Design a protein with these regions (language model features):
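SAM-dependent nucleic-acid methyltransferase catalytic core
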Residues: 7-12, 53-156, 160-166, 179, ...
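Conserved beta-strand signature within the Rossmann-like core of class I S-adenosyl-L-methionine
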Residues: 189-194
Length: 202
């Protein structure tokens, strides 16, 4: 799916890409664009990208003294008063959990634990080289789209799926989806919407 998204963006001819529900940032990390706007309401995700951009070396240094263990995974669910520490814990949990949800420790007898830590370091380096040029926002989708809409803008939207409960930290109401559709019908730029198909969406 990622390759399809990137191809649609390339064919749009737009120079600015806005990831409205940014999540992991995978789309922006792989898109070739002059301007990249990342947005997510999840404070943990936004804080992670901002912290890596400002204090990459501090995060990498912590990985040098970190083990891959279930005990540490459980301990890292606790919130501290240190923002850098909380960002690190969030990243650690997501890299070592099922489906990146940060909730359940993913253990495999085939996994080389030291390789996992190395992979985490590589992910930080990859993120940093790209996100240092991002604009990072934490806005409601309506405010974000209105702020960045232009003829040169491409919006990618992968919102919480309709009528799927308990999977997302922030869910949308039926009215939210209705207003999203109305807003997208009026924008100057182009958009790609990735959403599940059900009777309401149709």
């Amino acid at each position: 799916m990622l390759n399809d998204i990137l191809e649609i963006f390339r064919n749009s001819g737009k120079k600015t890409i806005v990831d409205v529900f940014g999540g992991s940032g995978k789309v922006l990390l792989n898109a070739e664009a002059k301007v990249k706007i990342y947005n997510d309401l999840n404070a943990d995700v936004v804080d992670f990208f901002e912290e890596v951009r400002k204090n990459k070396e501090s995060v990498l240094e912590k990985l040098n003294y970190t083990l891959n263990s279930r005990e540490l995974f459980t301990r890292y669910k606790e919130i501290t008063d240190d923002k850098t520490e909380n960002v690190f814990r969030y990243f650690y949990r997501n890299m070592l959990s099922f489906n990146g949800d940060g909730k359940s420790y993913s253990y495999s007898s085939r996994r080389n634990k030291s390789t996992t830590i190395t992979r985490m370091k590589e992910a930080i380096d990859t993120c940093y080289n790209d996100i240092k040029s991002w604009t990072i926002e934490r806005l409601d989708f309506r405010d974000l789209i209105r702020r960045y809409d232009s003829e040169g803008t491409f919006f990618y939207l992968d919102p919480p799926y309709h009528n799927i409960k308990g999977l997302y930290e922030y869910e949308l109401t039926d009215q939210d989806y209705i207003e999203m559709k109305a807003l997208l019908d009026e924008i100057k730029g182009k958009y790609l919407l990735n959403i599940n198909e059900d009777e309401f969406v149709r």
